[in-house]
Amino acid sequence: MHFNNKNKSLDCLNTKIWPSPAKINLFLSVTGIRKDGYHFIQTLFQFLNYGDYLIFNTTSDKKIKLINKIHGIRNENNLIIRAAKSLKDFMWKNKNHDTPGVKIFIKKYIPIGGGLGGGSSNAATTLIALNEHWKCKLSLNTLADLGLQIGIDIPVFIYGKSAFAEGIGEKLSLFQPKEKFYLIVIPPIKISTKLIFNKFILNKKSYLKSCNQYLKKPLKNDFEPMIRKNFIIIDNLINYLSKFSNFRLTGTGSCIFSEFDSECKAKEILYKLPNKIKGFVSKGTNISYLKEILKIRSNFNVLS
């Protein structure tokens, strides 16, 4: 779903409904691999005005329920459930035993296994929304710490600002790239980040650079050669689309994207996609729609 303040399907002041925006990695460089398998990276996150939305209804039975299951993901592995349980456990350990339950509904638009951060974004939205619904009154830093225990990418969604990430992705520095239009192309496959990390062989370590140093050269993704070699459909798509623009991988895929100065130009290429290949055009934004909604609701005093 495309987000904007005029969107009638997402009422800005309806505190039961919360946006969960997608992200892209404008570049991704692998600078090393730890003994435990985690990768040292440098990457630049930017948000899209596109994503899922979640609906939260508190209950008196203290149970956490996801009303509609996400196909292919078991509840115990679902980051929404894990985030809600993490917050509830934190409140319990801090002597708050009156935290109610919740029923959660998700409307899914972000493709699963696409490298757009859907699961991490869903978890971040859950932590922020339940922090309000359950009147936990925790700081963003505390929520980010809880999120980091679940997934490396979750803190950037908690803070809601574009950022240059280092370390294993947990060290964030605010950075504001240009807000361009992006054509996101969705191949009909899912790619497991964990699987790619396990298979990735670091043949040549990228040197540590500043974000500005990366932006002076053509942007790239160190996982892309491996992905293109192992997933021929992505290789074929990038080769085909290279006639129109320079496309590259976001995250560990499967989605690829290219940036444009105008929405019209991006849509022009969208209409040239091969049959059965989906895509969408979205504006990049340095402030996530979730953060915008949080600010609007605070200004109108509709939050707890």
From Swiss-Prot:
Pathway: Isoprenoid biosynthesis; isopentenyl diphosphate biosynthesis via DXP pathway; isopentenyl diphosphate from 1-deoxy-D-xylulose 5-phosphate: step 3/6. Its EC number is 2.7.1.148. The active site is at 23, 153. ATP binds at residues 111-121. It comes from the Bacteria. Keywords: ATP-binding, Isoprene biosynthesis, Kinase, Nucleotide-binding, Transferase. SUPFAM superfamilies: GHMP Kinase, C-terminal domain, Ribosomal protein S5 domain 2-like. One of its GO terms (biological process) is isopentenyl diphosphate biosynthetic process, methylerythritol 4-phosphate pathway. GO terms for molecular function: 4-(cytidine 5'-diphospho)-2-C-methyl-D-erythritol kinase activity; ATP binding. It catalyses: 4-CDP-2-C-methyl-D-erythritol + ATP = 4-CDP-2-C-methyl-D-erythritol 2-phosphate + ADP + H(+). Homodimer. Belongs to the GHMP kinase family. IspE subfamily. Catalyzes the phosphorylation of the position 2 hydroxy group of 4-diphosphocytidyl-2C-methyl-D-erythritol. This is 4-diphosphocytidyl-2-C-methyl-D-erythritol kinase. The lineage of its organism: Bacteria, Pseudomonadati, Pseudomonadota, Gammaproteobacteria, Enterobacterales.
